[in-house]
Curated annotation (Swiss-Prot):
Record-given protein name: Putative acetyltransferase SAR1027
Domain of life: Bacteria
Keyword Nucleus: no
Keywords linked to the UniProt accession: Acyltransferase, Transferase
Gene Ontology MF term list: acyltransferase activity, transferring groups other than amino-acyl groups; glucosamine 6-phosphate N-acetyltransferase activity
Disulfide bonds: none
Residues bound to CoA: 71-73, 79, 112-114
EC identifiers of the protein: 2.3.1.-
The N-acetyltransferase domain, residue ranges: 1-141
Species this protein is from: Staphylococcus aureus (strain MRSA252)
Function as written in the Swiss-Prot or TrEMBL entry: Could catalyze the transfer of an acetyl group from acetyl coenzyme A (AcCoA) to an acceptor substrate and release both CoA and the acetylated product.
Amino acid sequence: MFSKVIDPEMLEDCFYIRKKVFVEEQGVPEESEIDEYESESIHLIGYDNGQPVATARIRPINETTVKIERVAVIKSHRGQGMGKMLMQAVESLAKDEGFYVATMNAQCHAIPFYESLNFKMRGNIFLEEGIEHIEMTKKLTSLN
């Protein structure tokens, strides 16, 4: 269901999902949504019957750590385990790419979801694009 993005059309599908979720639903400015890290990130896309429904990206921070960013599931596909499957695919990709630690700036409303996946909060709540976030981290192991 989830694939590593390998062509411009797949990347456009990622941007479509992100625009729907972050720009249209959450009010993030469109000019902030696509950033300077797109080309150095590894993107994942999930399709359902040929329609793009979920995406995330990972960005190397150093030799051992990857930052998980832009995690998004289209509204019609939430509450069905899609987010959990997406995060499992993200973690698998990160491990396949040789990373041992994952970090992310999680939206605070999603803290329980990420805690259920064994991410731990670190630091204090901060605002990003007017939305409360907190850093969360996880050691990636082969036992996921």
